[in-house]
Amino acid sequence: MKIGIIVAMDKEFAQLKAILSNTETEHFNHKDFVTGRLGDKEIILQQCGIGKVNSAIGAVEMINHYHPDLVISSGCAGGADTSLEVTDVVVATECAYHDAYCGDEVAYGQIIGMPARFKAPTELIEKALSLNNLPDCKDLHVKAGLTVSGEWFVNSREKMQQIMDHFPEATAVDMESCSIAQVCHIYQTPFVSFRVISDVPLKDNKASQYYNFWERIANGSFEVTKQFINLIQNPSLIHNS
């Protein structure tokens, strides 16, 4: 099975590259890709850059060149749900844009001609949630819910509340997952967003949790992605909901 993992930043890239074996670097169309192994799976890892355009370009290049069975948007995200804590994990049941408006004829966040929300395969959500019950993941908390994406680093309670006014059920917020989900929808490639929570803006002050995450906590926190991938077995079982 071939799995593509897309992250935005170099810190996330370094964390995830460390869980791979037999790595090699390849360069195509201004993008670097690292290929490697994780157990019996072939992994293609890419640092796409921050934001929707960078991530969409990265997803297109990955799908066109490597044809993965599954694409995962990984790295970190802000927690929209105040019950979350730093290093918890959110697997997105669906993704939406929090900064798109195409008029009252469609839902807020919906691009005309596209679904209002991009849903992940139910089987992958169940696999991710099953991590909560594994003996060697006893300190782990995985939660499923809506992830919203937009061109904004959410570093204030005020901005987070503005997003929640439109998406009160949002669980996490990032800058890439929905654009990758849209590309995968168009290219008919299974997709899931699986993100480690770096901060919870509604419980934070001036992104102090976020910076503390990278300074003190991040090392090893992406091992959970390895655990998740190990649970994914048969690509034929992955269907879009």
Regions found by a protein language model. Give the residues of each.
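Alpha-helix C-terminal capping segments
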Residues: 61-65, 83-84, 181-190
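A C-terminal functional module that forms or caps the active site or interfaces directly
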Residues: 152-202, 206
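Active-site-proximal beta-strand elements of phosphoester/diester hydrolases
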Residues: 43-48, 146-148, 194
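N-terminal short beta-loop-beta anion/metal-coordinating cradle
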Residues: 1-60, 65-66
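Proline-aspartate-enriched helix->loop->beta-strand connector
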Residues: 67-72
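His/Asp/Glu-rich mid-to-C-terminal helical/loop segments that flank catalytic regions of hydrolases
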Residues: 201-240
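Mid-sequence, gly/pro-rich, charge-dense loop/helix-turn segments that line enzyme active sites
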Residues: 80-167
